[in-house]
């Protein structure tokens, strides 16, 4: 009788795309996993700013941005699912209509009230706004991991909020203590 493997839980971890990632959507990406369970996984790409800043987005959704320091912060590509919808990753500050508390410290909010709070200065000071999210069905992420598609490491909020986006990939790799140039995109087989 085969021993069943305990399910893995990668919530509050970074997924780091392996060199040679065939999918251009995720090549060179770092994904913060907000949720991972037997039904699948949900995460946000944290290192892919798009050509829109907070001021422009707030204009489009008719919100008056009263706090100028955030006006020129970039909006990010969070993933290929629901790209017309905003997802805010932030420190657990405030109570919002639709928030997912990520075990380990951060929250992901999808309701407009968090943007209203950011706009008037009463919201979280550390946040990352994405359009879209990254999603995997049951067993899909585990399959990609078994095929050498991703590296995983415990997430560090400082990388999300304090490191420039173009340096987040290498900063996440450094958490593993490895040299990315020494990795092959091919899995070895005996």
Curated annotation (Swiss-Prot):
One of its GO terms (cellular component) is cytosol. It comes from the Bacteria. InterPro entries: AlgH-like. Coiled coil: none annotated. It holds the Pfam family DUF179. Belongs to the UPF0301 (AlgH) family. HAMAP family: UPF0301 (MF_00758). PANTHER family: UNCHARACTERIZED PROTEIN YQGE, UPF0301 PROTEIN YQGE. This is UPF0301 protein Reut_A0705. It comes from Cupriavidus pinatubonensis (strain JMP 134 / LMG 1197).
């Amino acid at each position: 009788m085969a021993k069943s493997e305990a399910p893995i839980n990668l919530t509050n971890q970074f997924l780091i795309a392996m060199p040679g990632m065939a999918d251009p959507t995720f090549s060179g990406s770092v994904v913060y996993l907000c949720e991972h369970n037997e039904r699948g996984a949900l995460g946000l790409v944290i290192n892919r700013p798009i050509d829109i800043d907070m001021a422009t987005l707030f204009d489009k959704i008719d919100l008056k941005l009263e706090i100028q320091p955030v006006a020129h912060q970039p909006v990010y590509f969070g993933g290929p699912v629901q790209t017309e919808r905003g997802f805010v990753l932030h420190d657990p500050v405030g109570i919002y209509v639709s928030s997912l508390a990520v075990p380990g410290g951060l929250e992901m909010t999808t309701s407009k009230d968090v943007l209203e709070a950011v706009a008037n200065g009463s919201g979280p000071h550390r946040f990352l706004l994405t359009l879209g999210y990254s999603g995997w069905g049951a067993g899909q992420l585990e399959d990609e991991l078994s095929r050498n598609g991703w590296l995983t490491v415990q997430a560090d909020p400082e990388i999300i909020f304090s490191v420039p986006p173009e340096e987040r990939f290498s900063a996440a790799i450094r958490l593993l203590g490895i040299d990315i140039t020494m990795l092959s995109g091919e899995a070895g087989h005996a």
